[in-house]
A protein has these predicted regions:
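Conserved alpha/beta-hydrolase "nucleophile elbow" surrounding the catalytic nucleophile
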Residues: 28, 95, 99-101
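Short beta-strand/loop motif that positions the catalytic acidic residue
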Residues: 195, 201-203
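Conserved HGGG/HGGXW glycine-rich cap/lid loop of the alpha/beta-hydrolase fold
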Residues: 10-66
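Flexible "cap/lid" loop of the alpha/beta hydrolase fold
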Residues: 105-150
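Catalytic active-site module of serine/aspartate enzymes centered on a nucleophile-bearing elbow/loop
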Residues: 223-250
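Active-site loop/oxyanion-hole signature of alpha/beta-hydrolase fold enzymes
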Residues: 45-49, 56-94
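Conserved alpha/beta-hydrolase "acid-adjacent" motif
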Residues: 208-214
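Hydrophobic, aromatic-rich cap/lid helix
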Residues: 162-188
């Protein structure tokens, strides 16, 4: 594990697994971190077995990165800038970017702005990107995640309850997660037509946050869509998720 300093003074944690070829940069979803989203579910191991050079970033507010409680320290653009700053820090000239849920939106922003991105794989998001410009807040409101991070966990139901259970299981800083969620109630994706790199949309068949993933793939000029088994948390654990990702990146 290592850290670098952002433009606004935060220390962000990242991990590197050495390999060959174009580096694969991973960005996890809200509440999760490198271990929860990628290592424990077998994604990193699958990429390692295929010989890839893998890098994973803990987003601000998550994992081993700094976790300010001020919502003003978070935004979609800030987190996209964090990933691009990591490219700079490591001297990366070519990258493949993989993002899940919140990380998928970040990956789209980076791919649309940075010519170093040669391939893009996104999961845990679907038609909400097309219809809402980002996370599908028709399914879960940002304020619901904020509210879920405080009070009695047993009183939180549905998708907000899922995120609360995950936060408690990971020992996440719930006040920081609430600050993240409060800052992300916007539509950062204005257009997908400029993202012309080969892209893969991966979605769980029981994930309401990734509904109609084929519509997201159709909105990207050069994308394919693959549906695997599972809900928002379980889809990444389906062996087909890692296999499809490895095949796409190889």
């Amino acid at each position: 594990m290592a850290k670098f300093t952002t433009w606004d003074g935060l220390e962000l944690n990242y991990r590197v697994w050495e390999g060959k070829g174009v580096p694969v940069v991973l960005q996890h979803g809200i509440v999760a971190d490198t271990n929860a989203n990628w290592m424990s579910l077998g994604v990193v191991a699958a990429l390692e077995r295929a010989g890839h050079h893998v890098i994973s970033l803990d987003a601000r507010g998550h994992g081993r990165s700094d976790k300010p409680h001020d919502p003003a320290r978070y935004s979609w653009q800030a987190m996209a800038d964090d990933m691009r700053a990591l490219f700079d820090h490591l001297g990366l000239e070519r990258v493949a970017v993989v993002g899940y849920s919140m990380g998928g939106i970040i990956a789209l922003l980076v791919a649309g702005a940075d010519e170093r991105v040669e391939r893009l794989a996104i999961g845990g998001i679907g038609s909400g990107v097309v219809d809402c410009g980002g996370i599908d807040w028709r399914v879960i409101a940002a304020q619901d995640i904020v509210s879920a991070m405080s009070g009695d966990a047993t009183a939180v139901k549905g998708l907000p309850g899922m995120f609360r259970v995950l936060a408690d299981a990971l020992g996440a800083d719930r006040e920081a997660i609430a600050a993240v969620a409060a800052s992300l109630n916007e539509a950062p994706i204005q257009s997908l037509s400029g993202i012309t790199v080969p892209a893969l949309v991966l979605a769980g068949d029981a994930d309401p946050l990734a509904a109609e993933p084929e519509r997201l793939a159709a909105a990207l000029p050069n994308a394919e869509c693959v549906v695997v088994k599972g809900d928002h948390l379980a889809a990444v654990a389906d062996p087909a998720f890692s296999k499809t990702l490895v095949d796409f990146l190889s």
